[in-house]
Amino acid sequence: MDLTTDQVTRGMAGMMYVQDPNNDPLYSQLPNEYGVNDIPLNIQAKNFNFDDNNNVTSIKAGEKPGPGSWGMVNGVVGGVMHVPHSMVRLRMLNGSTIKVFNIGLTKELLYDYTTANDSIRFERMWMVATGGGYLDYPRPARNNLFSPGDRREFIADFGQYNPGDTIYLTHFDNKLPADAKYSKHWYSSAMMAFVVDETIRPTRPVTSIPATLKP
């Protein structure tokens, strides 16, 4: 009892896929090939303990852990993933205990929030679902606020880029409300990279998004 915060801080908060292809009319219309064009992204902030050689020895945890100074996606800091040259479903979860994220896709690697302005360009995605299920219709979205435990699903069209292009999953702190900034360590930075790879070919690639998601 009452150990969720400590357990999440020390380990991983994950997600389970619950699907019923036979009774989901949208199953074949949205990317659904796990690990190829249907990707879970568990976004967290962690603190680490380091030894004298600057190697990570453990996750830093306490009775009241802070938001963490390191961004982590699926247990990896600075990860890289190759994605197909087509539409990809990104199932995002804020698995942090306290950190609010402002997440989007960018072509740029890094921003300094002390000098950045609203000219930052987030790439367009379409939000299709939240923790409550499918939306009525796909909503265009460029960046999105995630509170702890929030879940959102997006369709990103990597087919609009050239093979070999790199697109970054970026957290932009400068666009957060002032009361949501819990740590001065955080600024806008790439949390992971997607590399467009034309050699990755889904069995059933999706080339368009349905106009409506609910009857």
Where are these regions (language model features)?
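Extracytoplasmic
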Residues: 11, 36-38, 87, 98
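Low-complexity, Pro/Ser/Thr- and charge-rich linker/hinge segments at domain boundaries
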Residues: 21-39, 199-215
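Histidine- and aromatic-rich segments of cupredoxin/plastocyanin-like copper-binding domains
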Residues: 43, 49-214
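Hydrophobic or amphipathic alpha-helical targeting/insertion segments
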Residues: 1-27
